[in-house]
């Protein structure tokens, strides 16, 4: 049992060092299992890179897992039967039902349940409460302590919905966030862990339940190695304020070290990856200089012409996007780069996304837009929703929303809409056709 940190700045080669270390040790000790724990979105890339670097181009005693995939591996080996897991859509449906039943008890939220996006926001809030282990009692305690009326009402409503949600799913369902809680209870029983080396990479910090798992790793496995982003010019084991540039990395180190000391687990000397220029920026000293001095406020400046960093000022998003298109075409046509090697990063995807998509389509540039599309924007979904609303009361809005989706187009609907507006017809509470003679529709 031991704990070791691999530290360094961004792009300094921490992950590459870890890959090479694991590959070498896995060949020397084929009887030991190496568990690479990375965020879900990095599992495939990590596997691909390890296979590429491995002399035999295969992984026999190295497993790349996320916390969630590790949970399912453990449950499968131990024969643990899980209740049905609620996904995001399931949670939204349960919250909508529970909140609807408790509507009269909600002081602030009651009037917003029909507002588009409100249930989704409430679902995200409840998911975060589950993820960080906040109970209904914790919310009640904070509600009692605060003197701010608006905050008290919000906490009260959240407590009511959260409590109703918990009661509804009890003994029938579990949320995805609760899977790791079950893993914490079952992990000590998993025999393969005792002969495993755990490697944590790609995390800027951990949630409370992930810290509990890291603690179990330290207690029951052979060794835990964790990569953290930190500045080699600063003290790694000293706590700092939240405003500090490397607060998250140093906080993670201090918390894991404290856990190790509580269980009398030795903390090995850390490995610093601080070669200059950094591995990621070895082709660009300017970017390496920027990584070393950005937000440091030390007064250092780059004295030469920064050819690898350019600033363009456009009048509007269209002009900016047009310039980006020209840069991409130049990189591909003159410098031999491929489209997959290029990325466009924006801080306001809502404003720039449509403009970028439009310009890229015009220029014939293939792209993937990392944006989640709402299903409500689909015209067929709008057709179904309008039809259901129309069955309720046949209101003007629902009927003409239905007609304007394009699936049931009737060239006479414009004339009919004008006639409806003229007669002032808003809704039809009576059965279909009862007013047909009066309105002519």
Where on the chain are the PLM-derived regions?
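Polyanion-engaging groove/track-forming segments
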Residues: 1-441
């Amino acid at each position: 049992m031991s704990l070791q940190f691999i530290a360094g700045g961004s792009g300094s080669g921490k992950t590459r060092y870890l890959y090479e270390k694991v590959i070498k040790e896995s060949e020397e000790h084929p009887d030991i299992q190496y568990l690479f724990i990375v965020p879900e979105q990095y599992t495939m890339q990590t596997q691909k890179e390890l296979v590429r670097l491995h002399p035999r181009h295969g992984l026999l005693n190295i497993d790349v897992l996320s916390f969630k995939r590790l949970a399912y591996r453990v449950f499968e080996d131990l024969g643990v039967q899980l209740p049905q897991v609620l996904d995001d859509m399931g949670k939204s449906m349960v919250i909508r039902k529970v909140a609807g039943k408790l509507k009269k008890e909600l002081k602030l939220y009651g009037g917003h349940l029909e507002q588009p996006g409100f249930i989704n926001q409430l679902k995200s809030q409840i998911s975060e409460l589950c993820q960080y282990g906040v109970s209904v009692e914790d919310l009640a305690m904070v509600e009692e302590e605060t003197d701010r009326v608006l905050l008290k009402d919000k906490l009260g409503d959240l407590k009511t919905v959260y409590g109703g949600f918990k009661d509804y799913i009890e003994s029938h369902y579990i949320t995805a966030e609760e899977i790791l809680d079950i893993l914490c209870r079952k992990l000590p029983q998993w025999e393969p862990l005792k002969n495993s080396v755990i490697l944590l990479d790609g995390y800027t910090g951990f949630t409370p339940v992930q810290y509990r798992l890291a603690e179990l790793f330290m207690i029951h496995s052979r060794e835990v190695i964790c990569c953290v982003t930190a500045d080699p010019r600063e003290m790694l084991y000293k706590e700092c304020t939240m405003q500090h540039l490397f607060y998250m990395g140093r906080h993670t180190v201090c918390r894991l070290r404290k856990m190790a000391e509580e269980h009398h687990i030795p903390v090995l000397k850390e490995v610093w990856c601080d070669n200059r220029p950094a591995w990621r920026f070895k082709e660009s000293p300017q970017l390496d200089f920027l990584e070393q001095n950005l937000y440091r406020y030390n007064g250092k400046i780059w004295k030469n012409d920064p050819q690898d960093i350019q600033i363009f000022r456009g009048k509007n998003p269209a002009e900016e996007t047009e310039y980006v298109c020209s840069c991409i075409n130049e990189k591909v046509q003159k410098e031999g780069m491929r489209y997959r090697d290029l990325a466009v990063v924006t801080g306001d995807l809502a404003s720039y996304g449509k403009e970028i998509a439009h310009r890229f389509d015009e220029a014939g540039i293939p792209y993937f837009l990392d944006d989640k599309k709402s299903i409500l924007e689909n015209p067929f979904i709008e057709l179904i929703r309008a039809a259901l609303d129309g069955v309720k009361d046949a209101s003007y809005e629902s009927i003409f929303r239905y007609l304007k989706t394009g699936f049931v187009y009737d060239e006479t609907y414009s004339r009919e809409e004008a006639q409806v507006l003229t007669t002032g017809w808003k809704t039809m509470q009576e059965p279909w056709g009862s007013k047909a003679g009066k309105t002519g529709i």
